[in-house]
From Swiss-Prot:
It holds the Pfam family ASL_C2. Its main location: cytoplasm. One of its GO terms (cellular component) is cytosol. This is Argininosuccinate lyase. Its EC number is 4.3.2.1. The keyword Amino-acid biosynthesis applies.
Amino acid sequence: MTGKEKKLWGGRFQEKPSSILERIGESVSFDHKLYKEDIQGSIAHARMLKQIGILSGDELSKIETSLLQIKTELEEGKLEFKSELEDIHMHIESRLTELIGETGKKLHTARSRNDQVTQDVRLYILGRGKEILKSIVSLRFSLYEKAKRSVDVIIPGYTHLQVAQPIRASQYLLSWFWALERDQEFFRFALKASDELALGGGAMAGVNYATDREFLKKELGLSKVSPNSMDGVSSRDHILEFLFACTQLMIHASRICEDIILYSSQEFGILKLSDSLTTGSSIMPQKKNPDIAELIRGKAGRVIGNLNHLLVMLKGLPSTYNRDLQEDKLALFDSVETVEISLEGIREMIEDWVWVPERAESSLKNGFATATDLADFLVYEKKVPFRTAHELVGTLVRVCVEQKRTLFDLPEPDRIAVSEHFVGKEYENAVSLSLSADKKISYGGTSKKRQEEQLKIALESLKQTETLFL
C-alpha cells in the first residue's frame, strides 16, 4: 500500500483493502457524532500520558492545541470524511498527525480503539442523557402548569375506551406527570451505567504501561473505574439500560399521543389543537390532522426496534470485542434524536391544546358516567345491597337507552317505575357530573380537594429535580 492509502493499522498488510471492505467497514457517516467525546477523551488521555512520562509538556501542549483546532474544523465542516479512514477516531488521529507529525502518533500509546470507542459512547450517553432529563422535567412542568389551569374542567375518564366516570382534567394531566417522573428516575438510573471509566482497558487485556486510571477518571468527571478490562471494553450494558429508558419513555409518549389523536377527533372532540400544530389534506379541504402526535406514535416503534436490534445483536457474541459492536451506535444515535424531538413535540401540543367542556359534558351524559354514583347513593343513603343497587341502575340505563334519553332528562315517572328512590333533589345530586368528581375523596382521587393536594405534591417533586442540574 502507498503511504497515502495506508491504514493506521496497515503495517501487517501488503494488499490494498477491497472496496467492499471499506464501504461496509466505514462508520464515520454516523459515528462523527462522537467527535466531541473523542476529543474530550483524547485530551484526558494525553494528560495522563504526560503524567506517566510518555509525553513531554511541550508535546502535550501541541496535542491539546491541535485537538481543539480539529474540533473547530469539524464544527465548521472543514474536515473532509474519507471512507478509507473508517471512523471519526481515525479521522481525528490522522488529522492530528498531519498537524504535528510524529508527536501526534504518540497519542495512541496505551490505548486501543476498543477502550477508546466505548469510553466515547459512555461520555455521549452521559451528555445527551442529561439533556433528555432536562426535556423530561420541562415536559413535566408543562403538564403541571396545564393541570393547575384545568382543575375546574370536568372531562370523561375512560376504561375500555368507553366513558367510565367524570374526572377533573387536572387528574388526567397529572397521571402523565407521574408517569414521566418514573421515566426521569429510570434515566437517572440508566446513566449510572455509563458513569464509569473504560479507558485504559486497551484491546481487552489491559496495557503494558503503568497508566493512571484514577487520574483519567477525575479528568473525565466520572464516578468509578471499570475493575476488569475485558468487561470494560466489551460490555454494552450501558447502552442497553439507556435504550430501555428510552423505550419506556417512548411508550408513554406514544400513549399520550394516542389520547391526543382520539380526544381531538370529531367523534370525541374534548380538546382542540391549534392550526399551527396540525396539517390538512391534499384532497379533502375539511381535514385537520394531528400529524405531530401521529408521527411521535410512529417514532415510538423505531425506538422499541432499536432496543430489540441491540438485544439480538448482543445475545450471541463471544467475549470480548467483536466488530458487530460497531452497529450499536446506529441504534443509540437514532433513539437519542427521536426521544429529543418527541419530547419537544408533546410539550408543544400540551401547552397549545384547549379543552372543549361542552363536548366533554355531552359525552359524560350520553355515556351515563354517573351510573356508579347513583348505585353508591342507593347503597349509602338508602341502604340497598350493592348487587341490588347495581341491577336497579343497570335497568335504569337500559330504559334510558330504549328512550334515547340520559339520566338527566329521563322523565321522573319512568325513573320511579324502576325504583322509588330515583326522585327529587337526592337523585339530581347523585347523578351530578361535578359532584361526582368531588365524591372521589380517597388519596390520589379526582376531588377538587385531592387535586389541590396533588398539585402541591407535584410542585414539590419539580423543586426536587432542580438538584439534578446544579
